[in-house]
Amino acid sequence: MKRTALLFIAFTLSLSVFATSISVRILTTKVITSFIVSPVNGSYRIYGDGVLLAETDASGIYQLTLDNDSIQLKSFEKTLGRFGAVKLISQQVDGAFKIKSVVSESKVRTYEDDIYVSLTADHKQLQVINKVDIEKYIGGVVESESGSRTSGEYYKLQAILCRTYLLAHINRHVLEGFQVCDDVHCQAYLSRTVDPEVQKSVDATKGLVVVDDDLNLITAAFHSNCGGETVASQDVWAVSTSYLKSVKDTFCLHQPHAHWKRSIPLEDWKAYLQLKHKYPVDDSLKFVDATSFAQGNGRAIYFTDRDLKIPLKTIRADFQLKSTYFSIEQQGESVIFDGRGYGHGVGLCQEGAMRMADLKYSYKEILNFYYRGVHLVDLSALNYFRQE
């Protein structure tokens, strides 16, 4: 059974796991009709519709602009032409470029390796793709998700989880001409790695992923802060797993996102319950329940445990609350949401894991604290089974 599962993994991942690079659409949160790009390290060859146009280094600055059904490419000196596709290909393994949308509030971002530019299917904007080494991409994701504020053991764990998530979703956008995007829909990827400790941790865990007892890649869920107790997967996504179970977590209790408060006008709260959920707010007992809800010894799934059950995740989404881990108390003409944690609460609690790393827990110990009964697998070990 185990060997059969390995064969299945090797087959399904053979086109992706052993590839060295990945295509990531960047700048996806903005409508890109024009941007400026310039190398910051190494030299780049510039191609328009497959024809070599120029070779440039850090002194070169280029603007690409949507022009009807084509891409206009300009340097400071001249217009190089209009094309259906433009590529900037690094000539060194450590090539990097900076890019900025021609919008005043946009920030400069820096990425490594190559850049491919084409039109979106509707020809209304530019599609900008970073063709990048997978391990460099993972480093960028780890830093985008975690920042530069913790220890190497945490970065190692986050790298493994990011790699696992990537390989489980590696062709999410393949029909759109790329593999993953740079937003949280896939994984946040806002720049290349800047902190050398991050890339060092990525390199130290190269090829490692997490699998369950059936040797399937796990759902590598994580969130900012669980508020003291993580949530089982079935209570958020209605999908039960053997490894995403509720875990009591004291490590995150004194971290930045452990507590929050929100005040909502009482009349707004009553109207919401009545109009959306047909909650009988005029019933005196039900009104007490609606204004004195508490989560005591464990996290609740529903707003009430009586006849009418309203999912807490629905209330969280409707009021844009930080978590579902909250209690409610009436204070005058308001209801106060006294909350704990930040995020959906499933899987790794990032702030708890960071605290564990600071306390000298190893990345393997942290992994097994939040994900029960999982295993680390080196993808290179699958070569044997792939060749059988």
Residue locations for each model-derived region?
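Positively charged n-region of N-terminal signal peptides that target proteins for export
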Residues: 1-4
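Conserved, single-site charged/polar hotspot
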Residues: 7-11, 16-388
